[in-house]
Amino acid sequence: MNKFTKTDVTPEKLFIQRRKIIQGMSVLSAAAAFPNLAAAKKTEEKRTALSFKADNKPDLILTPENKVIGYNNYYEFGVDKASPAKFASTLKTEPWTIEVSGEVENPMIFTLAQLLAFPLEERIYRLRCVEAWSMIVPWIGFELSRLLEKAKPTGKAKYVAFETLYDPANMPGQKNTLFGGGLDYPYKEGLTLAEAMNPLTILSVGLYGKTLTPQNGAPIRLVVPWKYGFKSIKSIVKIRLTERQPVTTWNQLTPHEYGFYANVNPEVDHPRWSQASERIIGSGGLFTVKRQPTLPFNGYEKEVAHLYKGLDLKVNF
């Protein structure tokens, strides 16, 4: 199996050293991924340093930061990979709240300050897109279960539904259907309650030591590392616990292509391409981008396979 090497991507320690030694390096790195320097500076100025417990996974070498913040899927800001970085600076992230409702004993509204008050930790995770490309990202956040426990799910709660901000004035893809890929907005996603409570599932508020960029889902997003990236909904404003499986955006649009579970599975191909391998973002050169075999559950099989015991994952994809 092909593995990440130090010649493929930049190690975590080198990123930290660069931040400490060269002031403003993150701005310049971001600018390389943006269509114009002004947008890069404006976005970087909004980011603030976070206090968190560091992760230490020497076997996972980070994708270069400029790739992570410059190569995104966020259709609210356009379908091209560079469009979110170009247009997402219009996203207004303050004030911000998340409403938690539905099958809970204690409905709550969390402010951004309250969300940032949760004990934060770094989670270096693999990210696998359904489009057959991958990254390794140092997210900063907290386990979703911590938030749900405060709301106290009732015995009827079986699923957790999520909803992205709806703001057509500042999210051009919501205003223009063609620009936004023809999706039904606001963007919606969902998990089973067991998936949501799994320790790997986090709400992320940052990456690379700072708060999230708008194009990466600021100010708070879901990260579920064993599922395809479209499950990790961005810019969340609503969380609702339900008794029945919630409607989710991509599954509603094309259910034969995007299942509700969307677990990374090299044995279940997308109707239009293979999922057996993945392109490693940030590896090689222009004509030598490397690929590697895709791992079941994106390499997290040991931690999550038990959630699907008795379930045919080729049918329930």
UniProtKB/Swiss-Prot annotation:
Binds 1 Mo-molybdopterin (Mo-MPT) cofactor per subunit. Mo-molybdopterin binds at residues 72, 75-76, 129, 164, 216, 221, 232-234. Residues 1-40 form the signal peptide. Belongs to the MsrP family. Heterodimer of a catalytic subunit (MsrP) and a heme-binding subunit (MsrQ). PANTHER family: PROTEIN-METHIONINE-SULFOXIDE REDUCTASE, PROTEIN-METHIONINE-SULFOXIDE REDUCTASE CATALYTIC SUBUNIT MSRP. GO terms for biological process: protein repair. Its EC number is 1.8.5.-. It is found in: Periplasm. It holds the Pfam family Oxidored_molyb. Coiled coil: none annotated. This is Protein-methionine-sulfoxide reductase catalytic subunit MsrP.
